[in-house]
């Protein structure tokens, strides 16, 4: 007797579309936040972080991003363990994803709201703290979300199909994030 799929094609597409949202957010941050805080060239944007270098080639912004990623590398296995061991009535994964939504929205918004509109050491500390909180928040969504994949497909063909849909959604998110440079001028000129 042939085993039926645990998740129909429509459900697979809906699940994979969840990748689109976090792909836009993560790629927007990775691709544009550096330009936002330390614009290059003759752009009309203000430099918001002092161009401090350590050892002559590591700048403050690199240290901010690196520190946030290091903390992310530590917290990801912790979140995975907590999700795996969860006994919540809504399931092992969904409660973590729901919990992550508001912190991701708040910290994602605050990343684009520096303390001052001018170059400031305070902006370095602000960005470091908010980026760490953002990375932890997004991990509370992404780690359990990705852990759902093996639970949806009963065989490698289904898992591969879902993973392919996720890759397509991720790529679309990357394209959307890459096309978002125009938002920078709006943000610095109008919102701050």
Would you name each region that the model predicts?
Residues 1-192:
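Membrane-embedded alpha-helical bundles of multi-pass transporters/translocases
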